[in-house]
C-alpha cells in the first residue's frame, strides 16, 4: 500500500474548495446529518442516564473525534517528512487529522439502542427466537451470518453509503479509515491473530461497495473478494476510541460513585508517572474537577504513546503485516489493563447497567418479532397476514413502508427493518415497544 493512493483513491477533488478540504467537508456533513444527531439519546455505558454529566454516544463520539484529530496530525507531520511527494500533491498534516477526526465522528453511527447489548439482542433474535429462526432457510449462508451476528461497524458502513443520505458523499479515505474490520461476516479461513479479523465491517448488501473502495485505495487483499488489510489510518481511529472509552468510562464511574475517587486517582497516577503531582491536585476543589484534570492529562500522554507506536511500525502497517491495537504496545498498556479489569467488574456489571441491558433484550426482541413478521407477510404471504400484523405494519414510518414495498428479497426486507429498529434512540425504542404491547396508549392514564 502507498500513501498517495491511500489518501486520494479515485476521488478527483480531495482538496476541495479553497476554504476547506474535502476531508473537512466530510466532518461538517457528518455533524449536520440525521444519523449523527440520533446518537444524542443512545447509550454509551450507563443506559438512559438521568444525570446530564454521563456520556452518551454523541458526547463520546465528539471526544473520540478530538483525540483522533490530534493523533492524525501528529502522525501526518512525521509521514510528510518521510514522503515529501505527498507535500508535492498538496497533502498536509491537517488532512491526516481531518480524515481521522471525521472517521472517529462516525465510528458509533451504526450502534443500535442499549449499547453493545443491543447488538447481542438483535443477533439473539435471529439465532434463538422462533420468529427470527423462521428466516434461516429464506436467505443465503452469507446473509444469515450477517443476521445472527449483527455488527454496529457494518451497520455504520451501510448508513454512510446509503443513497438516502446522499448529502454525505464522504471521501474514500474517510470511509476506509472508518472501517476497522475490512471483511465480510462469513469467512472460511479467518486469520485469528489479526485484530482486523475479529469482527466484520460490511454486510452482503454493501459488499460490492467495499470491494470498489478497497480497489480504489489499493488496500492489500487477504481473501479475494472477502477480506482486506486495514487502511493505515483505521489504526488511529481505533486508538482514539480505545483511549476515550477506557479513561472516560472510568471517569463516569467515579462520578456516579461506582469507583472510589482514591482508586480512580491511583489508576490515573499510574498512567501519568512523573507528571502526577499530588500537591497540585489537592489545591483543586471538587471531586469532578480533580478527576477531570487527571483524565485530560492522561489522554494527552496516551495520544503521544499511540502516535509513537504507529510511526515506529510504519513499514509493517503499509505492507499489511502489522495488525494489532496500538494501545496493546504502548508503555502504559499494563495500567490500561488494570483500568479495563476494574471497569468490567465495577461498571459494566453494575446493577444499573445490567437491569437496563436485560430490558434492552426484551424491547429489541419484541420489536423485531412484531415488525419482521408483519413485514414478511405483507410482502410475501399476504393471505396469512392477521389484522394485528396489518396494524403493526401500518405503524411503521411512511418512508420505511415505501422502501419495504420496493424490496423483492427477504434479506433486503430484513435489512430495512433492522435499519429502522437499530436507528431508534433508546427512549424511542422503549416508547414504541410500550405502545405495541398496549402498556402505553394515547389518552389512557
Regions found by a protein language model. Give the residues of each.
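Sequence-structural signature of the catalytic-core scaffold of metal-dependent phosphohydrolases
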Residues: 1-19, 31-42, 51, 62, ...
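Substrate-recognition/cap regions that form aromatic- and gly/pro-loop-enriched pockets
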Residues: 312-399
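C-terminal amphipathic alpha-helical interaction region
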Residues: 388-439, 445
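Acidic, low-complexity proline/glycine-rich segments
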Residues: 25-37, 328-335
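Intrinsically disordered or highly flexible coil/loop and linker segments, enriched in small
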Residues: 36-40, 131, 165-169, 184-188, ...
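Low-complexity, highly charged intrinsically disordered N-terminal segments
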Residues: 55-59
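Hard-cation-handling environments
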Residues: 275-327
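A short small-residue
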Residues: 42-52, 342-347
Amino acid at each position: 500500500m502507498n500513501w498517495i493512493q491511500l489518501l486520494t483513491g479515485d476521488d478527483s477533488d480531495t482538496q476541495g474548495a479553497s476554504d476547506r478540504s474535502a476531508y473537512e467537508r466530510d466532518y461538517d456533513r457528518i455533524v449536520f446529518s440525521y444519523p449523527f444527531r440520533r446518537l444524542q439519546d443512545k447509550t454509551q455505558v450507563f443506559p438512559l442516564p438521568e444525570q446530564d454529566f454521563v456520556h452518551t454516544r454523541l458526547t463520546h463520539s465528539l471526544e473520540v473525534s478530538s483525540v483522533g484529530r490530534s493523533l492524525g496530525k501528529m502522525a501526518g507531520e512525521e509521514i510528510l517528512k518521510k514522503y515529501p511527494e505527498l507535500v508535492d500533491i498538496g497533502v498536509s498534516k491537517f488532512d491526516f487529522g481531518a480524515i481521522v477526526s471525521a472517521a472517529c465522528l462516525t465510528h458509533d453511527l451504526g450502534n443500535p439502542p442499549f449499547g453493545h447489548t443491543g447488538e447481542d439482542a438483535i443477533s439473539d433474535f435471529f439465532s434463538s427466537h422462533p420468529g427470527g429462526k423462521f428466516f434461516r432457510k429464506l436467505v443465503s449462508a452469507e446473509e444469515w451470518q450477517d443476521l445472527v451476528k449483527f455488527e454496529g461497524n457494518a451497520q455504520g458502513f451501510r448508513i454512510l453509503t446509503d443513497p438516502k443520505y446522499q448529502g454525505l458523499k464522504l471521501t474514500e479515505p474517510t470511509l476506509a479509515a472508518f472501517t476497522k474490520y475490512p471483511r465480510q461476516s462469513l469467512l472460511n479461513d479467518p486469520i485469528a491473530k489479526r485484530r482486523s479479523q475479529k469482527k466484520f465491517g460490511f454486510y452482503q448488501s454493501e459488499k460490492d461497495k467495499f470491494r470498489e473502495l478497497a480497489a480504489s485505495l489499493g488496500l492489500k487483499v487477504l481473501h479475494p473478494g472477502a477480506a482486506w488489510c486495514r487502511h493505515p489510518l483505521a489504526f488511529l481511529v481505533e486508538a482514539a476510541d480505545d483511549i476515550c472509552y477506557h479513561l472516560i468510562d472510568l471517569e463516569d464511574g467515579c462520578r456516579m460513585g461506582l469507583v472510589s475517587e482514591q482508586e480512580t486517582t491511583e489508576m490515573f497516577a499510574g498512567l501519568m508517572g512523573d507528571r502526577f503531582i499530588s500537591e497540585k491536585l489537592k489545591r483543586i476543589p471538587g471531586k469532578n474537577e480533580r478527576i477531570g484534570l487527571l483524565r485530560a492529562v492522561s489522554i494527552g500522554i496516551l495520544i503521544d504513546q499511540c502516535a509513537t507506536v504507529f510511526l515506529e511500525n510504519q513499514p509493517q502497517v503499509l505492507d499489511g503485516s502489522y495488525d494489532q491495537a496500538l494501545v496493546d504496545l504502548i508503555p502504559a498498556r499494563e495500567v490500561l489493563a488494570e483500568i479495563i479489569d476494574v471497569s468490567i467488574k465495577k461498571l459494566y456489571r453494575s446493577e444499573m447497567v445490567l437491569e437496563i441491558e436485560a430490558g434492552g433484550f426484551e424491547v429489541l426482541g419484541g420489536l423485531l418479532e412484531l415488525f419482521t413478521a408483519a413485514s414478511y407477510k405483507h410482502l410475501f404471504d399476504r393471505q396469512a397476514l392477521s389484522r394485528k400484523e396489518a396494524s403493526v405494519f401500518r405503524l411503521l414510518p411512511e418512508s420505511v413502508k415505501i422502501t419495504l414495498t420496493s424490496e423483492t428479497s427477504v434479506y433486503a426486507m430484513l435489512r430495512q427493518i433492522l435499519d429502522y429498529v437499530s436507528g431508534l434512540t433508546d427512549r424511542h425504542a422503549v416508547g414504541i415497544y410500550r405502545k405495541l404491547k398496549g402498556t402505553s396508549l394515547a389518552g389512557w392514564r
